[in-house]
Amino acid sequence: MKYKLFILACIATLISCRGDNDEKFYTGKVVFPVRPNMGVKEAMAARVVPYPRQLEWQKLEMTAFIHFTLNTFTDMEWGTGKESPELFNPVNLDAEQWVRVLSEAGMKMVIITAKHHDGFCLWPTKTTTHSVASSPWKDGKGDVIRELRDACDKYGMKFGVYLSPWDRNAECYGDSPAYNRFYMEQLTELLTWYGKVDEVWFDGANGEGPTGRKQEYDWQA
């Protein structure tokens, strides 16, 4: 009888240990112990699970990305930064129609190029005159970001912005400290003027600015 009890105790211990091992999950990341062997690494890495916000992002399933800027009127993928704001005059722009159609198509979030590489801003930024404020659209009083934001609110759509770090128009681009401040001011405007922004897209492109210099981005700012 004692022998049977001993065997049962051993089995229970093994099951308990196995259960602890299988149920140990790591959210977002895992920190390995000192000098672990490959088996330990593989076992621990296999139990890393996403953060709750990452799971919520996956549930969005489909997001619309709108590339709309001066390039729309010059038929160029990338602008040069020398285009005149006078070219921007979308007299029939209807952000509500955009969002309504996207919502009907099953999209749950819209992201727009608030600024692409040409440096033209779709909102009346205080950082540069290269924006909608200098265009004939609505006599310089239009704001594409505001109209899209309001349309997203109306249709229950999440809202995001793309802000290109590369700026082919800004004279301070290439003067790393100055442009980093300039860029942070633009990002701050977008994140504080329009309510909740659900997602921000950056870009790894790093070409030359109007002065022929490249920028060292302060990604940790």
Predicted regions located by residue number:
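Mature catalytic domains of secreted/periplasmic carbohydrate-active enzymes
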Residues: 21-221
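Bacterial Sec-dependent N-terminal signal peptides
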Residues: 1-24
